[in-house]
């Protein structure tokens, strides 16, 4: 990133959220603790014993947080990249998002990799420790459609904020 983008500010934020994706990502998008989401937005809360996807309402929770925070409509897109087709669409259309006040892109690859790392024998060997895991992640990023899309924005006037719901 350093070769293509100027880092104006680097901050770290910490929380007491559970590291499970279903809690942490919903909390990031809602701006609330899991217990507050359950209390105030029960229609978007999915309990552990329910078979429904636990992160199906990120967009709705983000919309609610924006309304609470800005108290006005903003031009926004939320893109959740869960497959190659969506990744290609994002890459092809990335410049269109420059007109937005906010564009949120969720890339599920790191989640998939972290879960597969403990379940698939080949990944257990390839990512046997943190150093190997980070190396695989870096290699993926450098060859990903996400990086390709970001490089198309080189020299454009926009702010990029990178966040994660993973501790490492």
Language-model-derived ranges and their functions:
Residues 1-168:
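Feature captures the catalytic ectodomains and active-site-proximal regions of enzymes
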């Amino acid at each position: 990133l350093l070769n293509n983008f100027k880092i104006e500010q680097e901050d770290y934020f910490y929380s007491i959220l559970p590291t499970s994706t279903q809690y942490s990502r919903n909390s990031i998008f809602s701006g609330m603790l899991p217990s507050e989401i359950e209390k105030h937005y029960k229609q978007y809360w999915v309990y552990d014993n329910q078979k429904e996807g636990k992160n199906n309402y990120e967009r709705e929770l983000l919309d609610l947080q924006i309304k609470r925070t800005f108290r006005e409509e903003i031009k926004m897109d939320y893109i959740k990249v869960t497959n190659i087709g969506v990744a290609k669409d994002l890459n092809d259309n990335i410049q269109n998002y420059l007109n937005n006040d906010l564009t949120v892109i969720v890339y599920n690859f790191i989640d998939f990799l972290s879960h597969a790392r403990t379940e698939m024998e080949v990944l257990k060997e390839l990512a046997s420790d943190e150093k190997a895991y980070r190396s695989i992640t870096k290699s993926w990023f450098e060859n990903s459609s996400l990086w390709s899309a970001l490089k198309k924005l080189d020299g454009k006037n926009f702010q990029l904020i990178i966040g994660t719901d993973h501790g490492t």
